């Protein structure tokens, strides 16, 4: 496959630059009224494709999501002194337009190959985000947490071949 430079830039801009410049824009607001006992939170969305080498040739997406994970740790290291906690969630397979187009919206093969036996549900991400935004997640700083049904913890995540 050939990938266009414009396409690459669009994916990087959407996934990496947008996070950095949004944090920069809202930094004063994030700092306002925070304390060590009540910090502000930033929760970025990465992907397991930024952790493992994906099956599909989604070069820019994988690189961008890996950059999101690194940006998360860099921001966390710099912002914790201002009582701002930064973490990331790295989802695995969830029903979406992007994944759906790759599997013709038939998630059954992915479910069979996932150690959990299913694809993700909105509640899976919501629960993790609630934890990270709550007092219970307040001591978790700079982490990228997978939400993938065990794919990264297992041998890999090639969900397409039998």
Question: Could you say what each language-model-derived stretch is?
Answer:
Residues 47:
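Residue(s) in the substrate-gating loop at a strand-loop-helix junction
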């Amino acid at each position: 496959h050939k990938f266009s430079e414009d396409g690459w830039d669009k994916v990087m801009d959407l996934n990496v630059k947008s996070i950095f410049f949004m944090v920069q824009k809202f930094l004063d607001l994030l700092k306002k009224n925070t304390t060590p006992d009540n910090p502000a939170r930033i929760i970025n969305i990465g992907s397991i494709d930024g952790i493992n080498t994906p099956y599909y040739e989604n070069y820019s997406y994988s690189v961008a999501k890996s950059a999101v994970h690194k940006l998360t740790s860099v921001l966390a290291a710099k912002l914790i002194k201002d009582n701002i906690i930064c973490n990331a969630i790295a989802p695995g397979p969830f029903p979406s337009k992007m994944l759906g187009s790759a599997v013709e919206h038939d998630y059954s093969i992915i479910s069979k190959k996932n150690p959990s036996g299913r694809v993700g549900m909105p509640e899976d991400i919501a629960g993790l985000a609630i934890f990270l935004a709550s007092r219970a997640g307040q001591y978790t700083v700079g982490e990228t947490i997978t939400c993938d049904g065990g794919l990264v913890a297992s041998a890999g995540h090639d969900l397409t071949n039998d």
